[in-house]
Amino acid sequence: MRNKVILIFTTVLIFAAMLMVTGCGQTEEEKAATDEFNKEVARIEAQLEQRDKDVASAEEVYAIEKPALDDKLKPALQTEITEAKALEFEAPKAPRKLEEITAATDELKKIDFTKDLEELNKVKDDLDISIKKCELVTAPKESYVVNCLKGIKNIDGVAAVTEDHDPNGNLNKEGGYTAQVYFSSSLVDDPYLDSDIIEAGTDGGGSVEVYKTPEEAKKREEYLATFDGGVLASGSHAVVGTCLVRTSNNLTATQQKDMEKAIIDALTNLDNAKTDDSKDETKESTDN
């Protein structure tokens, strides 16, 4: 009798163990609910694995020691990296009862780091592009500026100054520009249309002055700003990288803004690769 009891007890233990291995006696509905629960856990854990990869990529861009056109992007990326690293998730144990499994799964479905990662990657990409754009306008070659200006609507001709033909006399001098490219525009009234582009100066359309450093460009821009609103006003002026973009005072305010934007967009267009053309080939060009 004792052996029979032991045999029955052993059989019960084995059966219980089998139940644990095969789902601890869960119904098909409970098994399906548990699978859905585990699926959500795996989804969230996969997002965190992707987070680690995205953070590593973002940190590489953040570590680039070059200026960006938008100086707000680097601190913005630092914030995104910090917030992404703070994302946490500890997988809970699956409940046993159907109602509890379903409720827990519903809570897991509310956890989604997709938008966090999208924002991290967006700011990372924006900073990367901004750095590359800034490189284009950091002491660019004269030929690059000329080629950019030639493709802009309402710019009819361009001419780069030389040391022999430089009205301001600042080419290659200490604190002066390394290149100055004037352009003429059909938007300006007739008196300037038949003039020598360089002699007409900024009044004939505008110009782009290139400096060695952003500080030198800003210093020049601040100087021009002292004449704004007066009889000696020379038109609009804006610094981008180490370039000073100027438009004629003979243009309307709207025309100045549109022209300035078009020039900056062209200079910072990543499709416009810097060229190694000889400066002698870009002294003067007129579109027909």
PLM feature spans:
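A short, solvent-exposed beta-edge/loop patch
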Residues: 199, 222-288
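Structured segments of extracytoplasmic/periplasmic soluble domains
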Residues: 47, 54-57, 61, 80-90, ...
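Amphipathic alpha-helical assembly segments used for oligomerization, scaffolding, or translocation
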Residues: 2-6, 24-138
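Stable alpha-helical elements in mature extracytoplasmic
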Residues: 40, 77-80, 116, 141, ...
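Short, solvent-exposed recognition patches
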Residues: 84, 150-230
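Second-shell loop/turn segments in exported
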Residues: 132-139, 205-210, 244-252
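N-terminal "mature-domain start" segment
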Residues: 53, 60, 124-185, 257-288
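Sec-dependent bacterial lipoprotein signal peptides
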Residues: 1-22
